[in-house]
Amino acid sequence: MTKTKPTCLTRLRKRLAKMREIKILLASGNLHKVREFSGFFSELPPFGDAKLTLISPGDLSCAFPEVEETGASYEENALLKAAAFARAAGMPAIADDSGIEVRALGGEPGIRSARASEGSDSDRVNWLLDKMKGIRDRGACFAACLVIAFPNGKNIFGAAERDYFSAEGRCFGTLAESPRGTLGFGYDPIFTPDGYGATFGELGDEIKSRISHRAIAFKGVAQIVPSVLKYIAVHHNENCNGDLGRCTN
């Protein structure tokens, strides 16, 4: 009886089964983002027996660069961070860039949201509220772009013009007159998403993880997880304990 030659998918699944846990690096040390992204990744289904797991820079012994966000868009800034961290760690990395866009301000502060004012998140919230004093149109949206990059820049996504993957998400709502709630971070205490009577600062992680700009962008990321796993399986180094990196953890 002639044996059937294993298909590429069968061979891939066998290799993934040996790996069990596959790691991808979050290109941020922000503890709020680590928590938020960890929640996103925990909801991903396994591919065969392999699971894509998020790790943070604090889990590795690498020295990571300070990345200046000099891009002209969320995507460019996210790519700068993802590519730099991927090269430093020798493993795939995911990064995001985000901002709040206020209709009455022509989309500002946008990509400058994190640098719109010196000081803390609270200082930036107060800066924006001052800018909006006396303005009745409170329409705004949170925007985010997520990027996955690889250390060698190899294109695995079928897009000849680029060597990374990106996905965008937007969450529309209105600006509150004053901060409400102590949950979340950034501009969360003054952003009320459409369909809700509370700010992100009041709603908490359970709701935010379903409707936020990053959550919407991550749905696009989730669609290409099989491609990410396939790439890692093909390039997997058996001495790396399941990840594609040169750092230890």
Regions found by a protein language model. Give the residues of each.
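Anionic-ligand binding patches
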Residues: 12-16, 20-25, 31-57, 61-249
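Extreme N-terminal basic, low-complexity initiation segments
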Residues: 2-8
